[in-house]
């Protein structure tokens, strides 16, 4: 591991002698400058939609000199997104609450990739109108939003206990349907 959302370990990265480091816009600018001062190329991605991801794969393949190998992968990704968009047009939208943590409880807002990915899959982020990347929300706000599915920001193997805590509200459509 060479870092997280807040900071990167410059010494570890330099020791690994990478050909390229991929960052996001919230990486500390001084750390990005420090990497560049060591002659390490840095690519910053700000993927906010599934289409941005395919564009990034294309750009990274170009930077890595593997465009030919990446072309069929990118084409398959774009075809899959087109198929999802077509399928979504004939399906009913599902109201989704994407919970990132519980203390404090926060979710994803409008400018997030997760909101766009949910939309592509036929979901509607119940807090997708909030123009904040990770807004704090209350239990009452979630109950009022009546989500039909509640997602946790982790994989099933590390399922957080707070996801099951929603079972205390059986009137919430997501709980009634077992969509936790």
Describe the function of each predicted region.
Residues 1-180:
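N-terminal ligand-binding lobe of clamshell/alpha-beta domains
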């Amino acid at each position: 591991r060479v870092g997280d959302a807040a900071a990167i370990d410059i010494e570890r990265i330099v020791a690994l002698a990478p050909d390229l480091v991929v960052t996001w816009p919230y990486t500390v600018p001084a750390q990005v400058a420090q990497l560049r001062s060591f002659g390490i190329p840095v690519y910053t991605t700000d993927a906010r939609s599934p289409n941005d991801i395919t564009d990034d794969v294309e750009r990274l393949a170009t930077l890595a000199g593997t465009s030919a190998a990446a072309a069929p992968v990118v084409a398959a990704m774009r075809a899959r997104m087109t198929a999802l968009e077509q399928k979504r047009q004939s399906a009913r939208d599902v109201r989704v609450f994407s919970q990132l943590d519980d203390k404090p409880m926060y979710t994803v807002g409008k400018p997030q990739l997760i909101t766009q990915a949910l939309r592509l899959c036929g979901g509607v982020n119940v807090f997708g109108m909030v123009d904040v990347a990770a807004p704090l929300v209350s239990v009452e706000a979630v109950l009022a939003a009546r989500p039909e599915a509640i997602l946790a920001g982790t994989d099933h193997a590390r399922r957080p206990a707070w996801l099951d805590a929603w079972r205390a509200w059986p009137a919430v459509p997501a709980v009634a349907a077992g969509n936790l």
